[in-house]
Amino acid sequence: MQYWDDVLFQPFIATIRGEIYGVITQDELEEECFNLARRAIAAFKFPKISTDYETFYAIREEDTLVEVDESTEGAIPHGYFINDLGYKELEVLIAWMKVYWVEQLLSNADNFEDIYTDSNIKTYSRANAVDKNTKLMDQYRTYARDLETRYSRVNASRGASIGDINNE
């Protein structure tokens, strides 16, 4: 079993930039990463290894997770892959997680709200911030598609292959 906390969340968090991840709690971060991972798995076309997963709920006690029932107060969803995925599959999933992270950033108007309203204080342009993040999302989406295209054209022995689906 590969727990998402280990194989997806840590590499994802290491590659993104954003102040929000410095001010939210560990539980909020894990819940957000869980939702991004589910979207990334759904977006991954034709993985050669099944990306089926199981969900469980846990609460944090000091530095460990304790599995609990879904209805328990403070329970955070976590996931693990039933099959062991390779680096290539994980790389594609992390790339899609980045796309959905920027998309989520853009969809929240609070991220672009002016903090100051005084006419004497110069602040950044909200339009420029939105434009910059839109371009970033397009770059991440192009990168994710390129990774997925390269992934689908090479088999496990690194030979050229088109159409090998779940046969390894």
Describe each PLM feature range:
Residues 1-85, 146-168:
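Conserved short "hinge" loops at termini or chain/domain junctions
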Residues 49, 53, 102-114:
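Short, solvent-exposed secondary-structure capping/transition elements
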Residues 64-70, 90, 110-114, 132:
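Interface-prone segments of viral and bacterial extracellular assemblies
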Residues 87-106:
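Elongated alpha-helical scaffolds
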Residues 119-130:
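Eukaryote-specific, cytoplasm-facing alpha-helical/coiled-coil scaffolding segments in long proteins
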Residues 132-146, 151:
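Glycine-rich, aromatic-bearing surface loops/beta-hairpins
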